[in-house]
Each structure stands twice: as C-alpha cells, then as structure tokens.
Swiss-Prot record:
Keywords: Calvin cycle, Carbon dioxide fixation, Lyase, Magnesium, Metal-binding, Monooxygenase, Oxidoreductase, Photosynthesis. One of its GO terms (biological process) is reductive pentose-phosphate cycle. RuBisCO catalyzes two reactions: the carboxylation of D-ribulose 1,5-bisphosphate, the primary event in carbon dioxide fixation, as well as the oxidative fragmentation of the pentose substrate. Both reactions occur simultaneously and in competition at the same active site. Homodimer. The active site is at K167 (proton acceptor), H288 (proton acceptor). It catalyses: 2 (2R)-3-phosphoglycerate + 2 H(+) = D-ribulose 1,5-bisphosphate + CO2 + H2O; D-ribulose 1,5-bisphosphate + O2 = 2-phosphoglycolate + (2R)-3-phosphoglycerate + 2 H(+). The gene is cbbM. This is Ribulose bisphosphate carboxylase. Mg(2+) binds at K192, D194, E195. Binds 1 Mg(2+) ion per subunit. The record marks K330 as: Transition state stabilizer.
Length: 461
C-alpha cells in the first residue's frame, strides 16, 4: 500500500521544522528491498510504522491521529538518505514527573521499523532534539569538573585523567586485583572495573570493594594525591544496582566522592542508566558501551551509529561515555569520531546532518580506551585538539615493561610531550617511562616512529 500521500510531505523545510520546535528530526541511510515500493513509498511506510500507521488503513484513525503522523520531509535516493520528522507529542512521558525517556525515543525511531519486510536496511546517523523536548531529559548531574575538583585541579581545562582497566579483565581474585590497583595508583589517577567484573564466585564483590578501598587509601597516603575508582554496578535488577551502589558508598565513606559508578548502558539499557543517574546523582555516571558494535559498527547496516549512541547517552545523564580512539587504538573508529566528542562536550555542535543546541545541559566526558598506549597518545591529542578527557589504558599501562605505575607515568608524559609540541623520540630521551614505552610496545614504535631504535640508542637496547 502506497502511504506517501499521508506520511510524506516533501514541501516541508528543515528550517521551518526546526523553527516550529515541535518535531524530533532523524536522518537515516535506507535501502528499499527489491520487489516492493520505490524509495519514497518505502520511506513513507517506514514513517507510518514508526508512528501512527500500519500496513492497512484502520477505521479508528481520526483527524487528531493524522496530526501526529511522522512525516518524511526530505529524501535523496542517490545517497540513500531519508529524513523523518516525529512530532514530540508521540513520545512517552513518565507519569511520576512528566520527564522524557530514551526507551520511548528508541521504540519509535529505531523500533519495529528495523524488521520491515520492504526495507533492505535502515540505520540512523543523526537526530535533532528541539528545545521543548530536550528540556524533558535528565542530562548529566556530574561532570569531569567534579573529578578534577577531587583531584585538586582547576575546574576549567583540568586536563588529562590518566586511567586504566585492571587486566586481565577476569580471573584475578580480590587481593591480586587490589594489589594491581595500588601499583597503578602510584603513577595514575583513575581505575575502572572492566565491563564483566562484578560478583564472580572467585572474586566476591564485597571483599573486592573492601580491599580496593584499602588500596586507595594506602596509595593516597603514599603519593599525597587523591585517587579515583569506577565500580561496575550493572545488573538486571534495579534493586541489585542500588544495593551495590549503597555498599560501595558506605565502604568508602569519606572518599565517596572519589567513586564513579559504571553502567553497561548498551546491554543493560536506558532503565539501568536512569537508575544510576537518579538514585546516585552525586556520583560520576560512567557509561560503558560494551556490545554496541552489534548495531553501530560500520559493517552493520541496521540500527544506529556510535555518534547517535553517544548523543543519547548525554540526554540520559551519562557523565562520561566511551567514545573510541578515533582510529588510534585497537577498536573500530576513525578520525571523524572527534565530531562525536564535540557533540557530547560542547553546548553547540554540528553532527553529520543536524546542528544541536544543548541549552546549558551538562556535558558528557569522552572516555578513551581500546588499545591505547603512550606512543599513540600524542597523535590522538593532536587530532582531538585538547586533553580534557579520561583515558583508560589496560594493556597500555600494565603492558609497560616496568609495570603499572611506570605505565601510568608514561601516559602522563605523553600528554606533556603533546603540550610541549615536542618530537616524541627526542622527548623520550629525557623521560625514562616514556622511553621505556618504546621498548614495551615495539610494534607501535616501529609503525609510528620508524627510526626510534637508532635515535634512542642504549635507552632502547
């Protein structure tokens, strides 16, 4: 059935839709399946399925219903581009406080339309949120400024937070885990649970929390510097998440503001993120995106992009989210990922298709991880243009030839190298931990700095 007369209006302009302030706009790359309707007909069916329609006309439809139809307002068949305007009144609101929910946004914009028989594939690349709808989202309650404050740094341009993930990701018992934390904290700032770490039978949660608390206090006494830890509180059950969070805060007591809560936001979903955001508004909310590649990977033709995921995370209230390494690490990514970093940190930013004003909503910190080490960091900072972020290097710290503390120091020295605009190999001659990173990661050293062996001489022997 051709629904383009009802669910498409190509006379609408994006400028007028934005000025009207009553529509969420979404940009998709879509390909119709052969043997069905043309591009516009398929796009209109997509809009119908995403809002008020189905595959047939129904007798219960009235004029009001038609007034909240989603509408295709722009297509470019050559680029497989379609843009759809969704009236904000379509989206569900909480009955307790009238707030918006990402679950409803996803259900409409990327829900049943992903399984339509006449669509070969469709993937969301960007979306725009008007002020009236934006104001209904929680947004972050804490930011990197809160972490900088704990660390005793300026709250403007407080700089690089040197972090790690304790490796191996699974298999360490509580005491060896805490020992690794102590070792890293002698040189670094921030440690996070890896996403599967929790309450394994060989590493009971409460015992691990107590020992990490002890390790943090000893490291702070030894270095005279505050330390940070991000605990995984992800669970299927809301009550389990709250129980974990409350136990952690009770245990760390006067160091409670040194604690972030990590939530596996993709696998556990918006409900888990909102549970952490609302029950623990004073804690830094660390959004881990494990599993997201199933839909965000460039190889995936359905779903949505990592850019879209990150933008949704800011709306939900994530204080920080993993944003990849812009092609400088081991995970999929590209230099264009910096647009994602700007979208979640700035108050006014351009996406692939839409400009977004955030109206003062708190920013979300880019958290960088995935195959990073000190040798890759100067180029990463140069591409991004600043170092106001958290970086969690697992192998990049504990793979250092002199151990976790030296690995942490090498990462901090990498930021110093970039800030000074120094040649990394020349810089290494005066900074032992950074120099030893060349020996620790020789494959990267050969690829990035081909003549390093001769230039460093005995330092690289």
């Amino acid at each position: 059935m051709d629904q383009s007369n009802r669910y498409a209006n190509l006379n609408l302009t994006e400028k007028d839709l934005i000025a009207g302030g009553r529509h969420v706009l979404c940009a998709y790359i879509m390909k119709p399946k052969a043997g069905f309707g043309n591009f516009l007909q398929t796009a209109a069916h997509f809009a119908a399925e995403s809002s008020t329609g189905t595959n047939v006309e129904v007798s219960t439809t009235d004029d009001f219903t038609r007034g909240v139809d989603a509408l295709v307002y722009e297509i470019d068949e050559a680029k497989q581009l379609m843009k759809i305007a969704y009236p904000i009144d379509l989206f569900d609101r909480n009955i307790i406080d009238g707030r918006a929910m990402i679950a409803s946004f996803l259900t409409l914009t990327i829900g049943n339309n992903q399984g339509m028989g006449d669509v070969e594939y469709a993937k969301m690349y960007d979306f725009y949120v008007p002020p009236a709808y934006l104001k209904l989202f929680d947004g972050p309650s804490t930011t990197i400024k809160d972490l900088w404050r704990v660390l005793g740094r300026p709250v403007v341009d407080g700089g690089f937070i040197v972090g790690t993930i304790i490796k191996p990701k699974l298999g360490l018992r509580p005491q060896p885990f805490a020992n690794a934390c102590y070792d890293f904290w002698l040189g670094g700032d921030f440690i996070k649970n890896d996403e599967p770490q929790g309450n394994q039978v060989f590493a009971p949660f409460k015992e691990t929390v107590r020992l990490v608390n002890d390790a943090m206090r000893r490291a702070q006494d030894k270095t005279g510097q505050p330390k940070l830890f991000s605990f995984n509180i992800t669970a299927d059950d809301h009550h389990e998440m709250v129980a974990r969070g409350e136990y952690i805060l009770e245990t760390f007591a006067d160091n409670a503001d040194h604690i972030a809560f990590l939530v596996d936001g993709y696998v556990a979903g918006p409900a888990a993120v909102t549970t952490a955001r609302r029950r623990f508004p004073k804690q830094y909310l660390h959004y881990h995106r494990a599993g997201h590649g199933a839909v965000t990977s460039p190889q995936a033709k359905r779903g949505y992009t990592a850019f879209v995921l990150s933008k949704m995370a800011r709306l939900q209230g994530a204080s920080g989210i993993h944003t990849g390494t812009m092609g400088f690490g081991k995970m999929e990514g590209e230099a264009a990922d910096r647009a994602m970093a700007y979208m979640i940190t700035e108050d006014s930013a351009d996406g692939p298709y839409f400009h977004q004003e955030w109206l003062g909503m708190n920013p979300t910190t880019p958290i960088i991880s995935g195959g990073m080490n000190a040798l890759r960091m100067p180029g990463f900072f140069k591409n991004l243009g600043h170092s106001n972020l958290i970086m969690t290097a697992g192998g990049g710290a504990f793979g250092h030839i002199d151990g976790g503390a030296a690995g942490a120091k090498s990462l901090r020295q990498a930021e110093q190298c970039w800030k000074e605009g120094a040649d990394p190999v020349a810089f290494a001659k005066e900074h032992r931990e950074f120099a030893r990173a060349f020996e620790s990661f020789p494959h990267d050293a050969d690829a990035l700095y081909p003549n390093w062996r001769g230039q460093l001489g005995l330092a690289a022997a």
